[in-house]
Regions:
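Conserved alpha/beta enzyme-core scaffolds, especially Rossmann-like or related mixed alpha/beta domains
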Residues: 3-11, 115-149, 154-172, 293, ...
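Short coil/turn segments at secondary-structure boundaries
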Residues: 2-6, 24, 40-47, 116-137, ...
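Internal maturation/activation junctions in enzymes
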Residues: 101-134, 138, 158-216, 288-292
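Function-dense linear segments that define catalytic or interfacial modules
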Residues: 33-137, 149-154, 225-254, 258-260
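Generic recognition of stable, solvent-exposed alpha-helical segments in well-folded globular domains
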Residues: 2, 6, 10, 21-28, ...
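Conserved, charged catalytic cores of large soluble enzymes
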Residues: 1-60, 147-198, 319
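Catalytic alpha/beta core of large soluble enzyme barrels
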Residues: 69-75, 116, 211-372
Length: 372
């Protein structure tokens, strides 16, 4: 079971003002999150400020996200939201055809139609149980295109995570996604019509929403080039992945290319990197720039990660499943500071998992790459 803390503007205000009871509760929250990795942050007032215009116009309130943390849709006595997702593999970004996002959006709308057809065939208790789901899907046809392989793409282009170049690419990708998906949404409305909920809101679009960033933990493993998960950073460049069929050795695709280019792909080097928890900062055959490019999540400034998430949220009408990563080298003050950054940023709707590497000690590069 996954749970979330509902964090309000009032709570954030009290925390900023130094309220003793609020600080004690905050410390308990951080302790539990670091101990278990769980307890999502649901900034409910922020989510309602940032929800899609359709739901603002109808005054439909968002109460929570989903089992992950990328959904920002309302639910009430009449509606239960549905989660319709498709993802683009960013390792193929440079070869994306012109109308890829248009096609992805149309595919999702087809999925919605198919889902409604299935629900229409339900009878008896099943029909009653799914009636609120069916009503929401029919009225709003909310969908969300996401991505996997964000960090893989940065490595592919030899861009440092959090650098000015990475921010420019971030802007380029997600602004294009928003524009293309909106074009497809308008076209579908003209060709196939506008659902009743959107009509009531005065929004003449086929789909109430178009974008969200789900975790893609499983789908990324099955995708071409083995991209990194969603918009989150790589946790280890070489690692053993446990599976039902046994343990599998996983080497980051972009780093494997570099190893082969430099003639360093051998068992000894693989074992050495694995013994360093997938970090390559001790590899003397890498240049400093290459070491910076291939920093793993526990070495990347979490402030830079949040900055990139905040930047792209302007283009996303739902939200992102944002993970944070901390190691044994990180102080309690640093962990609290990063979480507070997420609380205070109105473009961060919430937080997903918190990963910790208790046995690994990493040197986190906490200097702003843009300022260097």
């Amino acid at each position: 079971m996954n749970i979330a803390w509902i964090i309000t503007d009032e709570f954030i205000g009290k925390l900023n003002n130094g309220d003793t009871e609020t600080i004690l509760r905050w410390n308990k929250i951080l302790y539990l999150r670091m101990a278990t990795g769980k307890g999502y942050f649901t900034k409910i007032d922020t989510m309602n400020r940032n929800k899609a215009q359709v739901f603002k116009n109808l005054n439909l309130k968002v109460h929570a996200s989903n089992l992950c943390n990328e959904v920002n849709l309302p639910a009430n006595d009449e509606y239960s939201f549905t989660c319709v997702i498709i993802n683009a593999n960013l390792t193929l970004w440079d070869s994306f055809p012109k109308h890829l996002f248009h096609v992805l959006h149309i595919m999702q709308d087809c999925n919605v139609s198919n889902y409604i057809d299935i629900l229409n065939k339900k009878t008896g208790i099943n029909a009653i149980f799914l009636s609120k789901v069916k009503k929401f899907t029919e009225d709003f046809r909310a969908v969300g295109t996401g991505v996997c392989g964000w960090h893989s793409l940065l490595m592919q282009k030899h861009l440092v995570y959090g650098s000015m170049e990475s921010m420019l690419l971030n802007e380029q990708i997600f602004s294009r996604m928003q524009a293309d998906l909106n074009e497809a949404n308008v076209w579908l409305a003209e060709v196939l019509g506008v659902p009743e909920g959107n009509k009531r809101a005065g929004i003449m679009l086929r789909n109430a929403t178009t974008m969200m960033m789900p975790p893609t933990k499983s789908s990324a493993e099955l995708s071409r080039n083995s991209p990194t998960e969603s918009i989150n950073p790589e946790t280890a460049l070489i690692k053993v992945k446990e599976s039902v069929g046994g343990d599998l050795l996983r080497i980051n695709t972009e780093f494997l290319k570099l190893m082969k280019e430099k003639g360093m792909y051998n068992d000894n080097e693989v074992e050495r990197i694995m013994s360093n928890k997938g970090s390559v900062q001790d590899c003397d055959w890498l240049t400093q720039h290459e070491k910076d490019v291939f920093r793993i999540a526990f070495e990347i400034p979490m402030s830079a990660h949040l900055d990139l998430c905040s930047q792209r949220q302007r283009f996303i009408d739902q939200q992102q499943s944002i993970n944070l990563y901390f190691s044994g080298s990180d102080s309690e003050e640093y962990i609290a500071q990063i979480h507070k950054q997420a609380l205070l940023d109105d473009n961060i709707n919430g937080l997903y998992y918190c990963y910790s590497s208790r046995n690994g000690r990493y040197e986190r590069n906490d200097e702003c790459t843009i300022c260097q």
